[in-house]
């Protein structure tokens, strides 16, 4: 069906390079992409929840929490690669409108792990996990048109 759409829209050319044939042959079907997205997102949610439960394990709880919670959030973001593809996802992550949000998310990932493994500070790890969640929310809102503007206005009204 996609090939028919390309031919009808004039996008299909007869001179196809070997690379374009490899890319087309290795691309996933839409149903496989949806299944991959759901599986990766579910793994991310489960890891985050497991990390929250493991926080209360004596001695190693903080390390387990930081690893599972951060890995869960990375898996949740990574799940969208199935929908968009890796190159398009990376391009969209670093667009000017969401560059700061992307940097904050990546920084919070790193700081959460640093506070657990190098600094051994539970309070700081929890703060960075909260910031991680807020940064991910802000990053996610950047994909919904005018959502961040609406959130800003709501907070401005609430604080005024």
Curated annotation (Swiss-Prot):
It is a multi-pass membrane protein. The keyword Transport applies. It is found in: Membrane. The chain crosses the membrane at residues 37-57, 64-84, 99-119, 124-144. InterPro entries: Vesicle_transpt_Got1/SFT2 (IPR007305), Vesicle_transpt_SFT2 (IPR011691). The modification N-acetylmethionine is found at residue 1. One of its GO terms (cellular component) is cytoplasm. Residues 58-63, 120-123 are lumenal. The modification Phosphoserine is found at residue 9. Pfam families: Got1 (PF04178). Belongs to the SFT2 family. This is Vesicle transport protein SFT2B. It comes from Homo sapiens.
């Amino acid at each position: 069906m996609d090939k028919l759409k390309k031919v009808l829209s004039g996008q299909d050319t007869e001179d196809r390079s070997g690379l374009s044939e490899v890319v087309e042959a290795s691309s996933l079907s839409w149903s496989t992409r949806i299944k991959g997205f759901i599986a990766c997102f579910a793994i991310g949610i489960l890891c985050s929840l497991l990390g929250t439960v493991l926080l209360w394990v004596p001695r190693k709880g903080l390390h387990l929490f930081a690893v599972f919670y951060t890995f869960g959030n990375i898996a949740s973001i990574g799940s969208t690669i199935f929908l968009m593809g890796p190159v398009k996802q990376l391009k969209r992550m670093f667009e000017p409108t969401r560059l700061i949000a992307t940097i904050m998310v990546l920084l919070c990932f790193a700081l959460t792990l640093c506070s657990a493994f190098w600094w051994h500070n539970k309070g700081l790890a929890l703060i960075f996990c909260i910031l991680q969640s807020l940064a991910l929310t802000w990053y996610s809102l950047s994909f919904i048109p005018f959502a961040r503007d609406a959130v800003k206005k709501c907070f401005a009204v609430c604080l005024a």
